[in-house]
């Protein structure tokens, strides 16, 4: 049986771009509401980004920049800079598990399972 958490029936470019956008939004805003399938896939991406942020080397900055959108936070700083300067020190003593998924009732229009994914 197929893995139900994977984003199927889409090409790899679409999948990569959706996960890039969602991961940048969760880093900037702290939490987002999305479908349960996207939240489960997004958890993997965000955990890897924060782990790269904890390393804080030039190579890890470049790898993180390649998988994030170039947007600003509410206070005007770049999302990548916010990841490395604010979020990474916050999770310095934590070994993984940086996100939490909270299940919501299904969406009204198409009965899709919804969830909130947030940083712990």
UniProtKB/Swiss-Prot annotation:
Keyword vocabulary terms for this entry: Ribonucleoprotein, Ribosomal protein
The transmembrane segments are none
User: GO:BP terms for this protein?
Assistant: translation
Any single Gene Ontology cellular-component annotation: cytosolic large ribosomal subunit
Q: Which PANTHER family match?
A: LARGE RIBOSOMAL SUBUNIT PROTEIN BL17M (PTHR14413:SF16), RIBOSOMAL PROTEIN L17 (PTHR14413)
Q: How does it assemble?
A: Part of the 50S ribosomal subunit. Contacts protein L32.
The UniProt family comment states: Belongs to the bacterial ribosomal protein bL17 family.
Name it.
Answer: Large ribosomal subunit protein bL17
């Amino acid at each position: 049986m197929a893995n139900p958490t994977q984003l199927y029936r889409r090409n790899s470019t679409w999948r990569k771009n959706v996960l890039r956008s969602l991961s940048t939004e969760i880093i900037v805003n702290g939490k987002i509401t999305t479908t349960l399938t996207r939240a489960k896939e997004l958890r993997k991406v965000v955990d890897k980004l924060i782990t790269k942020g904890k390393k804080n080397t030039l190579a890890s900055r470049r790898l993180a920049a390649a998988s994030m959108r170039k947007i600003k936070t509410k206070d005007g700083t770049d999302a990548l800079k916010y990841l490395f300067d604010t979020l990474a020190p916050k999770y310095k003593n934590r070994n993984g598990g940086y996100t939490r998924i909270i299940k919501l009732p299904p969406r009204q229009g198409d009965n899709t399972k919804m969830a909130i994914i947030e940083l712990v």
